A protein has these predicted regions:
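Anion-binding alpha/beta catalytic cores of soluble intermediary-metabolism enzymes, centered on
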Residues: 1-176
């Protein structure tokens, strides 16, 4: 076990404190230092409560966003849920439902899907990954099979991925 904090940290289980929040950030900072020094290939984190993390001049939304800030590239990280035969990644995370449509773009879909494709090839040894892209809107009816976001953002992004040689298919109705 690596020590990220030199001093003793008083932790009251289930109670967020400024002290435990500071220790969580020190642990993430240590992980980022070790990352920059190529000391590991994969980072697995424990939950971090955004309620007790206070960083001057920075609004802490979560550890994934903090890591992206440390790395300096919002499109360089991707949370992946991994099962035996299925991997799931999200274009948006911790985004209120009312803001999701405005949070997706062709660029975010292309960059995050490309990152997933590279990861599937490199880390999971999948020779030719096939990626299903879900629709944002539910299927409406036979005359109107997709919404504005599918027509203007998701389908053009899938076409751009195809131009890059990435097998991305969809959009699949998210409600079926």
């Amino acid at each position: 076990l690596l020590a990220a904090v030199d001093e003793e940290v008083k932790v009251d289980m289930g109670l967020p404190t400024d002290e435990s929040g500071a220790a969580a950030i020190k642990a993430l900072d240590r992980a980022m230092t070790d990352y920059r020094n190529n000391l590991y290939d994969v980072l697995i984190t424990a939950p971090v409560s955004s309620q007790n993390v206070k960083i001057e001049g920075y609004t802490f939304k979560g550890h994934k966003e903090y890591i992206e800030t440390c790395i300096g590239d919002r499109n360089s990280s991707l949370s992946i849920l991994i099962g035996d035969d299925l991997r799931i990644a999200a274009i948006t995370e911790k985004t209120p439902l009312a803001q999701v449509a405005g949070a997706i773009s062709q660029e975010s879909i292309v960059s995050k899907t490309t990152l997933l494709w590279q990861t599937l090839k490199r880390d999971f040894l999948i020779t030719n990954p096939r990626i299903a892209v879900l629709a944002l809107n539910p299927s409406i009816n036979e005359e109107q099979s997709c919404g504005k976001e599918e027509r203007e953002i998701i389908i053009p992004a899938i076409d751009r991925l195809a131009d890059k040689g990435i097998q991305a298919f969809g959009p699949y109705p998210a409600d079926e």
